Design a protein with these regions (language model features):
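Alpha-helical transmembrane segments of multi-pass membrane transport proteins
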Residues: 146-153, 162, 185-628
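Alpha-helical transmembrane segments and membrane-interface helix-loop junctions
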Residues: 1-82, 86-211, 488
Length: 628
């Protein structure tokens, strides 16, 4: 009885939060779109638009914190070899965004091949998650009390923003409690809460040890919590707090302030809009129109179905900006067709996963937006560099598909009339490329404005396609959930980055790299090996936030252009989506198709080789330019 009641309350809380997130995202879109329209058509402005957007981002993150604390896809589970098992709710893998924030989860898996007992890992991970929630509640609460004054444009108390985050932390603990009661694991929750309260209390009571480099302890603790399956934002917050006991100069309220500052930057407003574009494209059927158009162009050639998957991926990349979006969409759209025409399931799934890499390379790209915010680089230049890199990677994949085309069927040649008809139906998607890439490159609109216009454009197209209101609402809710996940990851990494900067780790890394000399070939080769290794374990968002500030100075000191290296960094980390043990793109396809991930990893090798070849060409050109 108690479990059933908790299950019902948990579902109601989840749906209420998703609805609140959808409404917040709708208000955010209306605010930014109205500001752009007034500026260009009425030669006026919307006073406080940027400030309002910043407040709405904090609201989204606060709403998403309870969902992030219970989400199974927002963590890395190396011991299972695939995403952490869920409680068996409806199976619906996330379709947008590099970070899955979907606690509907995947099927439960057997307990074989675990290297440490599941219960111990669960309790440890849960305790760390609760420590992070307590830190958010306490630190944000103190910041809310300390902050004075009001917002200059909105007239709201400045203490309201940290108060919202503190409330999100309270709801997160409630969500975790309901989940454990629903699963009949109340004792486990009490154990985790006791450990968390003890750690939080002890950290404030024990005199600091004053280590010479607290950031080293910080990195070790963060890596341990990440590998234990702790949700990524919590895996940054809790170690940063614990490191205070080792001399880190950052109290709770300072951590809360840094987190708020990190997740409320106006540039990040583009992220929910690009995620919404991908969701609306799928809901409206425009993504399916892209498939038909791609099939009409290349489906009749050697390995025609494979080339259709690739061309659709390239076209969809220019609209969604999300590799998870393409992997989920491709699994549903292409897997049945490829297997029905004789392609082995593991090869079909590997192809879909490999093509999905392009979505975070070809603009718009969520990864480049995160990198621009983390490293203070030009968003427009990064997107332009990603466009060139994406086309090069697509060319190498096309060659790999052609060489392996004996097992991939082709479709009948489309007539000229059919090609024109499919092209006309796909025109709405091509308009997005003009708005985003051309608008930013020409300097007509900022990245955030381009993203808002693209989302508004896609919303109008969805209405014109007579998309059901329920599907549009679901697209807003899904995008809001995933936006919250990304914002929380970026915000939680801000205290982490501050502590690393205070310790001068970037300078230490640069000095350690001094033995390579100023030879750009050696530097870029060493950095490639490092980033490929990082991509084996970390999600791209976390990897960018942690390693961009460390590796970028090394590359610049060797004479490598920072934009060029930024593109290489993202390409390296995206290739990690195909490599074990994590391989998030392979995991997504495996969960959607039911193909064992071990078979998918093995079948991905030809495409992995093709992408590594493209990386070598990009790296060689960067080193060559720096050399001369």
């Amino acid at each position: 009885m108690l479990a059933s009641m908790a299950q019902a309350l948990s579902l109601r809380l989840e749906r209420t939060l998703e609805l609140a997130g959808a409404l917040t995202l709708a208000v955010l879109l209306a605010t930014v779109t109205a500001s752009v329209a007034l500026r260009y058509f009425a030669a006026s402005g919307f006073t406080g638009a940027e400030e309002a957007a910043s407040w709405l981002l904090v609201t989204l993150a606060s709403i998403g914190l309870p969902l992030a604390s219970t989400a199974k896809g927002l963590r890395i589970d190396l011991f299972e070899g695939r995403p952490a098992p869920s409680d068996g709710r409806d199976q619906r893998p996330s379709a947008r965004g590099e970070l899955i924030i979907d606690n509907r989860g995947t099927k439960p898996f057997s307990s074989e091949n675990r290297f440490v007992p599941q219960d111990l890992r669960t309790i440890f991970s849960g305790a760390i998650t609760l420590v992070a929630c307590i830190v958010v509640i306490s630190g944000s609460g103190k910041a809310a009390l300390d902050l004075g004054g009001v917002s200059p444009s909105l007239g709201l108390s400045e203490g309201l923003r940290p108060a919202m985050l503190s409330a999100g932390g309270v709801l997160a603990i409630v969500a975790i409690l309901l989940r454990h009661v629903a699963d009949g694991r109340l004792v486990a929750f009490v154990s985790m809460l006791a450990i968390a309260v003890g750690l939080h209390s002890a950290d404030g009571a024990v005199p600091p040890m004053d280590l010479e480099s607290p950031s080293f302890m910080l990195c070790c603790l963060a890596l341990l919590t990440i590998l234990a399956g702790t949700p990524l934002p919590h895996a940054f917050i809790a170690p940063a707090y614990v490191t205070v006991a080792f001399g880190a100069p950052m109290p709770e309220e300072a951590m809360a302030a840094a987190t708020l500052s990190g997740l409320s930057r106006y540039l990040l407003t583009a992220i929910p809009f690009f995620l919404l574009v991908g969701a609306l494209l799928t809901a409206s059927g425009i993504a399916s129109d892209l498939v038909c158009f791609a099939a009409a162009l290349v489906g009749h050639r050697r390995a025609g179905l494979g080339q259709t998957v690739l061309l659709t991926g390239v076209l969809f990349s220019g609209a969604s900006g999300s590799s998870i979006a393409n992997a989920a969409f491709g699994s549903a759209a292409f897997m049945p067709q490829l297997t029905a025409h004789g392609t082995p399931p593991e090869r079909a799934g590997a192809l879909i996963a490999a093509v999905s890499v392009l979505d975070n390379i070809i603009p718009p790209s969520i990864a480049f937006l995160i990198l621009a915010a983390a490293a203070d680089l030009s968003t427009g230049k990064l997107l332009a560099g990603g466009f060139v890199a994406g086309l090069l990677m697509a060319a190498t994949l096309a060659i790999a598909i052609h060489v392996n085309g004996a097992t991939t069927a082709r479709t009948a040649r489309a007539s000229a009339g059919e090609s024109r008809r499919f092209g006309v139906r796909a025109l709405p998607a091509f308009g997005l490329g003009i708005i985003v890439v051309a608008g930013i490159r020409a300097g007509v609109v900022s990245p955030t404005e381009a993203a808002a216009l693209a989302a508004a454009y896609t919303l109008v197209a969805a209405f014109l396609k007579r998309t059901a209101g329920q599907e549009i609402g679901a697209a807003f809710g899904q995008s809001a959930r995933e936006t919250a996940a990304i914002l929380l990851l970026i915000g939680s990494a801000a205290p982490f980055a501050f502590l690393i900067a205070v310790d001068g780790v970037a300078a230490q890394v640069s000095s350690l790299a001094g033995w390579l000399g100023s030879n750009p070939f050696l530097v870029i080769a060493a950095l490639n090996l490092l980033l490929l290794g990082v991509g084996l374990f970390l999600d791209i968002g976390a990897a960018i936030l942690l390693f961009a500030p460390l590796t970028l100075p090394v590359a610049v000191s060797a004479g490598i252009d920072p934009i060029h290296f930024g593109v290489i960094l993202v390409v390296n980390l995206m290739i990690g989506g195909l490599t074990p043990p994590v391989g998030i793109l392979v995991q997504t396809v495996g969960n959607a198709s039911g193909v064992p991930v071990v078979a998918l990893f093995a079948a991905s090798r030809p495409y992995l080789l093709a992408l590594l070849s493209a990386l070598a060409l990009l790296s060689f050109s960067a080193a060559l330019v720096a050399f001369f």
